């Protein structure tokens, strides 16, 4: 594996440079704005390129050191891609709703995850002693917990870095990460507040093509970090038990399924 590559042209084609209408801007984003076109702020891709590369390397280095990455994106345009990308690289995600205390009150969240596991075991076992209504109520509880916690139920502890799409919507996630000293990588549109973001990526946070590109690049950086960690520890990639074959590099995936 190698660090993911991208070009300024690819960013342009994905619409990364398009900000919001000038009325909706956040003055703190002024240093990252190139100009105005048709009353829309244009983000400076000459800054985005090195900042995106820096962010990807930060994520890669965290993973290479054995760290966990939490993908966060609950807006409709991002939710699906956030989950898919995190799963593809064996990491974790929140794509439904950020619950208050998801990081700062991890002990309580762990209790809810335990409850989810208990329900899974209950429904997988013999339910003949329960009424249809009881089974239905339990199933609804499970669905609610799965939506909220399904992406972090196997995380096993606090993440080591966050990747966030839309810091306005995920303001609480940024605040909780800041309180705990967890670094934040985030896409910042022209209406975003860069405060509390360790690794800013100036770019459109609404266009599906742009969101898909960010998620794919971050997932690839994670996979490169996993490869680096395994090489450093002298392990054979093909013998890794924790990763699904589809997220291993092709030669190793073939060995894992052979």
Curated annotation (Swiss-Prot):
In its UniProt record, a GO molecular function of this protein is: structural constituent of ribosome
- Keyword terms of this UniProt record: Ribonucleoprotein, Ribosomal protein
Gene Ontology biological process? translation
Any Pfam family: Ribosomal_S2
Q: Does the keyword Ribosomal protein apply?
A: yes
Which Cys pairs are S-S linked? none
Gene Ontology annotations for the cellular component aspect, listed alphabetically? cytosolic small ribosomal subunit
In the record, the note on similarity to other proteins reads: Belongs to the universal ribosomal protein uS2 family.
Under HAMAP family, the record lists: Ribosomal_uS2_B
Output the PANTHER family linked to this UniProt entry: 30S RIBOSOMAL PROTEIN S2 PROKARYOTIC AND ORGANELLAR, SMALL RIBOSOMAL SUBUNIT PROTEIN US2M
Q: What is this protein called?
A: Small ribosomal subunit protein uS2
- Which species is this UniProt entry from? Granulibacter bethesdensis (strain ATCC BAA-1260 / CGDNIH1)
